[in-house]
């Protein structure tokens, strides 16, 4: 007896076969969802360390202390003869010094070599008495007393030295913005004459947030 006309056979013949590739497409969708979840998780993890309004980046990828931001100033040393010194007191903008009682936690100096840089310089930051005239003799003595960290920055074959930052921690001294005029950046040109267009010094002063600090520093 021919069973091809039976109801069961008819229903079987009418069943749609799975479309070619549907199973692989489903697997791809699952893989995409898994990848998306991984990316979201990674994004959340990275976001923890990103600078925000309250925690702007200060040292490399390190964030400022909670409740702190920083103000940057740039110094360009003049010509410094071989074996001689240069010093300049920190001068923050009036919009910052108006809040002179806000605490300062750290000072960072970043040496930016310009295209002509081919020298060796020593850089430090020191609290200098107001009576000091920042003479060569006075600066020389401050470099030699060992009371402050010193960054030695020198020309490299590549033109760039990896370590170009000096960090000075003031948190235990309870220094404030008003005290910053008592601090000076000091430079010693060791091996040869430093031309005025060889380096720029970027000084970052990390301090408690003030009312005007509503944007990330640039």
UniProtKB/Swiss-Prot annotation:
Compositionally biased region (Low complexity): 23-32
Positions of post-translational N-acetylmethionine modification: 1
Alphabetical UniProt keywords: Acetylation, Capsid protein, Ribonucleoprotein, RNA-binding, T=3 icosahedral capsid protein, Viral nucleoprotein, Virion
One Gene Ontology cellular component annotation held by this UniProt entry: T=3 icosahedral viral capsid
GO molecular function: RNA binding; structural molecule activity
Pfam families: Cucumo_coat
Family annotation (SUPFAM superfamilies): Positive stranded ssRNA viruses (SSF88633)
Main location: virion
Subcellular location: Virion
Record's compositionally biased regions (Basic residues): 12-22
Stretches the record annotates as Disordered: 1-32
Biological role stated in the UniProt entry: Capsid protein. Probably binds RNA and plays a role in packaging.
Similarity annotation: Belongs to the cucumovirus capsid protein family.
Domain comment in the entry: The N-terminal arginine-rich stretch does not seem to be the major RNA-binding region that allows formation of an infectious ribonucleoprotein complex.
Protein name per Swiss-Prot or TrEMBL: Capsid protein
Source species taxonomy: Viruses, Riboviria, Orthornavirae, Kitrinoviricota, Alsuviricetes
């Amino acid at each position: 007896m021919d069973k091809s006309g039976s109801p069961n056979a008819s229903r079987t013949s009418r069943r749609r076969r799975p479309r070619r590739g549907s199973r692989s497409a489903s697997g791809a969708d699952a893989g995409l969802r898994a990848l998306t979840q991984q990316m979201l998780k990674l994004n959340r993890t990275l976001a923890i360390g990103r600078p925000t309004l309250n925690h702007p980046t200060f040292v490399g990828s390190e964030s400022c202390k909670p409740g702190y931001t920083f103000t940057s100033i740039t110094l360009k040393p003049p010509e410094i003869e071989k074996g001689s010194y240069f010093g300049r007191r920190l001068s923050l903008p009036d919009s910052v010094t108006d809040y002179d009682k806000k605490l300062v936690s750290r000072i960072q100096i970043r040496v930016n070599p310009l295209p002509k840089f081919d020298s060796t310089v020593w850089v430090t930051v020191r609290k200098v008495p107001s009576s000091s005239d920042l003479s060569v003799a006075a600066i020389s003595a401050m470099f030699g007393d060992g009371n402050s960290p010193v960054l030695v920055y020198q020309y490299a074959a590549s033109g760039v030295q990896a370590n170009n930052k000096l960090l000075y921690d003031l948190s235990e001294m309870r220094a404030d913005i008003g005290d910053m005029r008592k601090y000076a950046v000091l430079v010693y040109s060791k091996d040869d004459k430093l031309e005025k267009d060889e380096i720029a010094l970027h000084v970052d002063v990390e301090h408690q947030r003030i009312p005007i600090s509503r944007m990330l520093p640039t």
